[in-house]
C-alpha cells in the first residue's frame, strides 16, 4: 500500500493543482502519467446537470469510437435461422437461442456484449434478472435489440461504448488505451463527448456538464474545461 501511495504522490506532481486543462493539454499530460505494468485505460468522468429519477432527464445511448477501445470484445447473439447465420458471418463469438438462454440461466456467460432480435426478447426476458445487474441486457437504445444483427456485431467489435447516467448524474467510460496516439485519443474522447451532448435532455436546464475529468486506471484525474466539453457538437 505504501509503495502505491508513493507512486501516486509522484504522479500528482505532474498534474497542476487547481488547473483546468483543455483537451489537448489533458491528453498530453495523461500520457505522462502511465506508471502501471499494463496498458492502462484512459477514462472519462462527467457530472451532468440532470436528475435521472425523472424519465425525461435520463441520458443513455451508445457510440462507436473511431479508434476502438483497445479491448477484445466477445459478442453473443440471440437469434434464429437467417439472422443467426448473419450474426455468425459478421463474426459473433456465440450464436444461439433457447440453448444460449439455458446457458445464461446456469451462469455460463462467456461474452461481453449480448445482442438479440426483437422477436426473441420474450425469451431474453427469462434471464433479465441475471443480465440486468451485469449490464448485459439487450436494449434498443444501445442498438443491441435489432434485426440488423450484422451491424450490431460490427459495432460491438469495432469499439462501441454504451453509456448511462447513474443516480447521481455521473457518466464514466473507458475511451481507449494510454498506448494510443494523441490523435486517436482526441478523436475517441471528442466523439464520446459529442454523443453525450447530442443526448442532452430538453428538460435539462442551465449548464449541462458540471464537471469533467480524464484519468488512467491508476492515476490522478485531470480536470477538463467544461465549456470546451459542452462546445463539442
UniProtKB/Swiss-Prot annotation:
InterPro entries (alphabetical): Ribosom_uL1_bac-type (IPR005878), Ribosomal_uL1 (IPR002143), Ribosomal_uL1-like (IPR023674), Ribosomal_uL1/biogenesis (IPR028364), Ribosomal_uL1_3-a/b-sand (IPR016095), Ribosomal_uL1_CS (IPR023673)
Record-linked Gene3D superfamilies: 3.30.190.20, 3.40.50.790
The keyword Ribosomal protein belongs to this UniProt entry's keyword annotation: yes
A Gene Ontology molecular function term of the record: tRNA binding
Keywords: Repressor, Ribonucleoprotein, Ribosomal protein, RNA-binding, rRNA-binding, Translation regulation, tRNA-binding
Pfam families xrefs: Ribosomal_L1 (PF00687)
Any single Gene Ontology cellular-component annotation: cytosolic large ribosomal subunit
CDD domains assigned: Ribosomal_L1
Tagged with keyword tRNA-binding: yes
Record GO biological process: regulation of translation; translation
General function of this protein: Binds directly to 23S rRNA. The L1 stalk is quite mobile in the ribosome, and is involved in E site tRNA release. Protein L1 is also a translational repressor protein, it controls the translation of the L11 operon by binding to its mRNA.
Subunit structure: Part of the 50S ribosomal subunit.
Family the entry assigns: Belongs to the universal ribosomal protein uL1 family.
Name of this protein: Large ribosomal subunit protein uL1
UniProt organism field: Campylobacter curvus (strain 525.92)
Amino acid at each position: 500500500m505504501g509503495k502505491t501511495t508513493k507512486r501516486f504522490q509522484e504522479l500528482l506532481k505532474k498534474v497542476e493543482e487547481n488547473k483546468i486543462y483543455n483537451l489537448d493539454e489533458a491528453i498530453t499530460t495523461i500520457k505522462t502519467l502511465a506508471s502501471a505494468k499494463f496498458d492502462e485505460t484512459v477514462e472519462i468522468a462527467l457530472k451532468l446537470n440532470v436528475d435521472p429519477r425523472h424519465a425525461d432527464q435520463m441520458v443513455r445511448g451508445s457510440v462507436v469510437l473511431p479508434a476502438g477501445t483497445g479491448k477484445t470484445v466477445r459478442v453473443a447473439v440471440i437469434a434464429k435461422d437467417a439472422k443467426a447465420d448473419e450474426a455468425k458471418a459478421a463474426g459473433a463469438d456465440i450464436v444461439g437461442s433457447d440453448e444460449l438462454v439455458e446457458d445464461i440461466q446456469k451462469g455460463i456467460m462467456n461474452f461481453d456484449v449480448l445482442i438479440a432480435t426483437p422477436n426473441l426478447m420474450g425469451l431474453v426476458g427469462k434471464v433479465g434478472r441475471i443480465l440486468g445487474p451485469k449490464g448485459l441486457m439487450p436494449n434498443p437504445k444501445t442498438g443491441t435489440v435489432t434485426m440488423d444483427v450484422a451491424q450490431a456485431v460490427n459495432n460491438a467489435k469495432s469499439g462501441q461504448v454504451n453509456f448511462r447516467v447513474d443516480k447521481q448524474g455521473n457518466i464514466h467510460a473507458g475511451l481507449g488505451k494510454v498506448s494510443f496516439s494523441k490523435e486517436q485519443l482526441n478523436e475517441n474522447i471528442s466523439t464520446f463527448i459529442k454523443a453525450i451532448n447530442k443526448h442532452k435532455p430538453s428538460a435539462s436546464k442551465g449548464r449541462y456538464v458540471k464537471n469533467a475529468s480524464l484519468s488512467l486506471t491508476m492515476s490522478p484525474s485531470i480536470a477538463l474545461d467544461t465549456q470546451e466539453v459542452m462546445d463539442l457538437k
